């Protein structure tokens, strides 16, 4: 048999896998034990760590629920085999946050054919046959970043400046949508110039750093960097700092985790970030609704929020960080 790598560490994970007395939740037949399999794309990025943490915390409230999380190690092939294995185990609900859309669509369809309810989280697949999709609206977030950019560069109709956009993974819906929303707004401003051809930073800080290092060498005047997530924006900031040019450039990111994006905004390294909530806890709640025979929404959109100098400190305080 093939070896599988599952993560179930820490107290919360342990509690999540305990099967004790019937839960007081609405989770259908409380004498029945449910097994949810969650295929997570990676566990190295901080946003993913928070995602799993929230999910395990929610699952731990339900003693009759066992949550198994697999780590796709940021590779499509690994994630496909993780999902195959959940199908073989006949989990009650499959949750998946895919590396990319195209490569994971086939195996998601396979799970649906096997009559397993599928909840897709954050990054989408190329089918809408799943039971539910839960995530932020990345077009809306992109537009918010676009509006913020226009404001920073002089306001509607008068905005002027050179912009570098650093993409997340180009084969993912969040990157496409974050571009789309942003472009919808800034392309209306004739004074705003986009300097680079789309460049794939695969959501990674190091790639943001490298792409920005090249951009700094090619362009004498860069006014604003729009990173598709906070790590990319921060990588770009570090590159500008190493080139002694960070003070002339504004940096915008997305995610808004207190200990990363919000902290960078509070320190004045990023100008703003836009919250992209982790969908794990909601995924558990919807999965239990499915088990209870309740109807769930086909699309559940999580809200965003703009974080800049005006509210960063307050958010850190509320998170117990500053
Ligand atoms: C983490 C991450 C987040 C980003 C999301 C998009 O893996 O890169 O930073 O917002 O995925 O799917």
Regions inferred by a protein language model and the residue ranges of each:
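A residue-level marker of the well-folded mature domains of exported/periplasmic proteins
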Residues: 7-11, 18, 28-322
């Amino acid at each position: 048999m093939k070896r599988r790598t599952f993560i179930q560490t820490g107290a919360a994970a342990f509690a999540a896998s305990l099967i004790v007395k019937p839960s007081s939740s609405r989770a259908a037949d409380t004498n029945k034990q449910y097994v949810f399999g969650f295929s997570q794309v990676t566990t190295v990025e901080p946003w993913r760590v928070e995602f799993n943490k929230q999910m395990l915390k929610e699952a731990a409230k339900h003693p009759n629920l066992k949550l198994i999380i697999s780590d796709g190690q940021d590779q499509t092939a690994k994630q496909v085999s993780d999902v195959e294995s959940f199908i073989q185990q006949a989990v009650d609900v499959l949750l998946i946050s895919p590396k990319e859309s195209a490569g994971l669509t086939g195996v998601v369809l396979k799970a649906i054919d096997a009559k397993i309810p599928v909840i897709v989280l954050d990054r989408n697949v190329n089918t809408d046959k799943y039971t539910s999709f839960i995530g932020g609206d990345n077009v809306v977030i992109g537009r918010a970043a676009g509006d913020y950019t226009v404001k920073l560069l002089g306001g509607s109709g008068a905005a002027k400046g050179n912009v570098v956009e650093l993409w997340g993974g180009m084969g993912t819906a969040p990157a496409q949508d974050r571009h789309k929303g942003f472009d919808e707004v800034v392309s209306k401003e004739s004074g705003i110039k986009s300097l680079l051809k789309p460049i794939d930073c695969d959501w990674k800080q190091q790639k943001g750093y490298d792409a920005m290092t090249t951009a700094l060498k090619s362009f004498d005047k860069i006014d604003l960097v729009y990173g598709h997530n906070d790590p990319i924006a921060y990588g770009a900031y570090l590159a500008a700092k190493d080139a002694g040019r960070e003070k002339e450039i504004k940096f915008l990111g997305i995610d808004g985790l207190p200990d990363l994006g919000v902290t960078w905004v509070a320190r004045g390294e990023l100008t703003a970030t836009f919250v992209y909530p982790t969908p794990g806890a909601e995924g558990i709640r919807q999965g239990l609704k499915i088990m209870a025979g309740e109807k769930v929404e086909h699309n559940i959109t999580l809200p965003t929020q703009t974080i800049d100098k005006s509210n960063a400190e307050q958010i850190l305080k509320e998170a117990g960080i500053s």
